[in-house]
Swiss-Prot record:
InterPro entries: DUF896
PANTHER family attached to this UniProt entry: UPF0291 PROTEIN BC_1827, UPF0291 PROTEIN CBO2609/CLC_2481
One annotated Gene Ontology cellular component of this protein: cytoplasm
Protein name, UniProt field: UPF0291 protein SAV2573
Domain of life assignment: Bacteria
Organism: Staphylococcus aureus (strain Mu50 / ATCC 700699)
Lineage: Bacteria, Bacillati, Bacillota, Bacilli, Bacillales
């Protein structure tokens, strides 16, 4: 992952010497991009979850169904 490698490179450099203003801005932008990707992955994972009780009935929370609809996994 190029973004994560660059984030780590800047973090290691920051431990040795102060970052320039441009490097700080790059670091902030990279971190925001990385967090956005992770959030997207988590939402995708949660939107495909199905919760079943011990009896075998689907008890998936409505919020998960809303996520599925929002991301196009189901159609109403």
């Amino acid at each position: 992952m190029k973004i994560l490698d660059r984030i780590n490179e800047l973090a290691n450099k920051e431990k040795v010497q102060p970052l320039t203003v441009a490097e700080k801005q790059e670091q902030h932008a990279l971190r925001q991009d990385y967090l956005s990707m992770i959030r997207g992955q988590v939402l995708t994972t949660f939107s495909t979850i199905k919760v079943v009780d011990p009896i075998g009935q689907d008890v998936t929370p409505d919020k998960v169904y809303d996520l599925r609809q929002q991301y196009g996994y189901i159609q109403n």
